[in-house]
Regions:
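Short glycine/proline- and acidic residue-enriched helix-loop micro-motifs
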Residues: 57-69, 135-144
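Conserved acidic catalytic loop of the alpha/beta-hydrolase fold
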Residues: 59-90
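Flexible "cap/lid" loop of the alpha/beta hydrolase fold
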Residues: 103, 107, 114-145
Length: 190
């Protein structure tokens, strides 16, 4: 079957990819690959590099040279995972910053990319309109360290970035956010 690699947002773990969605892909013959990006979940932590100011780096013309690593590095990680799994190529999919990583995989590792699916993402072009202030506020706010606060932060983010045409299932989201917290809470993940 086809390989389908899924990348997620900056401090989101692989567990945020819906099990039913991934299961439906698998039932259709896809080998679904989900993984935690650097500094997130159960992946390698780069604590020695410090915590970058992501909001400042998102500003137009911002100097990103102080970042401990780049989208290129994260795309190379993804391509390396395909190599480690013995896979020549995959359909690459990412949401939010994961979409930016997927785009970077597609241009840095074109031979490994069967197709590109970029969900609610950006090219990073500074001429594009920025996110709304409400979205920036909720996305740039680090969740509190306690489980209940982290779950509520996830719900707030879902309400802001979700579509009014597709209401969120709050109980389902609470369960998934709680399971993600229990697996490996990494609020400073980038």
């Amino acid at each position: 079957g086809c390989q389908f690699a899924a990348y997620d947002d900056r401090n989101a773990q692989m567990t945020l990819w819906d099990e039913e969605f991934c299961g439906a892909l698998a039932e259709r013959g896809h080998f679904v690959i989900r993984f935690d990006n650097r500094d997130v979940g159960l992946s390698t932590k780069f604590d020695h590099a410090g915590v970058p100011n992501v909001a400042a780096m998102m500003k137009r013309g911002a100097d990103r040279s102080a970042a401990p690593y780049t989208l290129d590095d994260m795309a190379d990680d993804a391509a390396g995972l395909l190599d480690a799994l013995g896979l020549e190529s995959a359909h690459v999919c990412g949401a939010s910053m994961g979409g930016m990583i997927a785009q970077t995989v597609a241009y840095r590792h074109a031979g490994k990319t069967r197709s590109l699916i970029s969900i609610m993402s950006s090219t990073g072009n500074p001429e594009l309109p920025p996110p709304t202030p409400e979205a920036m506020k909720v996305l740039m706010t680090r969740p509190p360290a306690d489980r209940a606060g982290a779950i509520e932060t996830s719900l707030r983010a879902a309400r802001v970035i979700g579509s009014p045409g597709f209401p969120i299932d709050e109980e389902r989201l609470r369960r998934r956010a709680g399971a993600t917290y229990d697996r490996a809470f990494t609020p400073l993940g980038t």
